[in-house]
Amino acid sequence: MKILLASDTWSPMVNGVVRSVELLYHQLLALGHDVRVVTLAQNGHSHEENGILYVGSISAERVYPGVRISAAGALPISHWLDELEAWGPEVIHTQSEFSTFMLAQRVARRCHCPVVHTYHTVYEDYTQYLFFSERLGRMTAEKATRILSGYCSLMLAPTEKVRAMLNRYKVSCPVVTVPTGIDLTAFGPAKDNGEEKARMRAELGIPEGDTVLLSLGRLAAEKNHAQLVRLLAAQPEQSRPWLVFVGDGPARPDLEALTKELKLTDRVRFAGMVKPDEVPRWYRVGDIFVSASQSETQGLTYFEGMACGLPVLCRADPCLDGVVENGFNGWQWKDEAEFASALNTIISDPALRVQLHQNALATAARYSAEHFAQQVLDAYQQAVALKQYEPEHRSILSWV
């Protein structure tokens, strides 16, 4: 099958969307499909490399840290459109709602092929970056998503939470839930009797045998990492675990300041940004994966943590229903008391920790990269059968 993937983000950027799209790309290639990618370059220079089209872009940091948009005049539209039309994609799978989505629409118009779109970002959780009024921001996100759905044959939701939200928005195309997969060959429990774990903990100044809570991902306000620091401060000092943040982002200075304010510098570590191939070993540094975020759409880090054998202790969120099950592979908590109770239960019961570890591995096995790719391919076939690229929908093309 000839498949065009369109995403505003790609390596060397590190985030959940990039990991998801690149995993899909490599899985589709491994299955023998003809796959090309259009994405944004990290500068104003448009170029092609190994079947990937990089569109020149400019920074939009004032909107949100790390965001880029296609640069005016950077698109070699006629040359690339002619080339893609000659190639003839059977389906286009968009991963972003902005620059590459609009370019994908131009290709779809020429090739008369369906567009499948994965809705990775719950924009309701990001309205503070664009609007003074939260209500106005939510209304705008809903209306914009509904308009965008008119240019798609099918939308993919990474979780039931996102699917329910899209249905609440009354989007005009069918929505299918396809959880993001993980590479189980990369993520898994340690195979070296804990030697690497002990070494990495020693480098962080963490004594052997102490409990480590691990959070991995972008440090941004909407991820609510500050609550994790406050929850740690509320634990009894004599039995207080360590908290390790792996990742970087705009919220890091505030988190470091909060850590100092609460006198927790002796119990909190900031590992910073790590290379993608080093992510699995950092998960294994922890004993429990923790999160206070309610802005997740994929739950990718939860799956990865469980694939490394970590039980999950996370803020209750509909996106985790059926994934994190209380007492089976972790706990979902709603307040400080529930967090403290679950944490104490895990720490104080060695036999339970072993069971949680085994159940976490079993849960992660359901989200293999191979299963993920097959579900996406099934969605492509559904979109082709619908054959629903609407030629009368044209106004969005004027945005390019």
Task: Give short role names for the model-derived ranges.
Residues 273-274, 281-286:
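Short alpha-helical donor nucleotide-sugar binding micro-motif in glycosyltransferases
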Residues 325-337, 345-351:
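Conserved acidic donor-binding segment of nucleotide-sugar-dependent glycosyltransferases
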Residues 1-56, 397-400:
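N-terminal subdomain of nucleotide-sugar transferases
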Residues 19, 211-234, 250-256:
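A conserved mid-protein helix/loop that constitutes part of the nucleotide-sugar donor-binding site
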Residues 311-314:
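Short hydrophobic beta-strand element within catalytic cores of glycosyltransferases
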Residues 294:
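Aromatic "clamp/platform" in nucleotide-sugar-dependent glycosyltransferases that forms part
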Residues 39, 53-56, 138, 142-195:
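Donor nucleotide-sugar binding/catalytic pocket of nucleotide-sugar-dependent glycosyltransferases
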Residues 254-274:
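Nucleotide-activated donor-binding/catalytic signature segment of Leloir-type glycosyltransferases, i.e.
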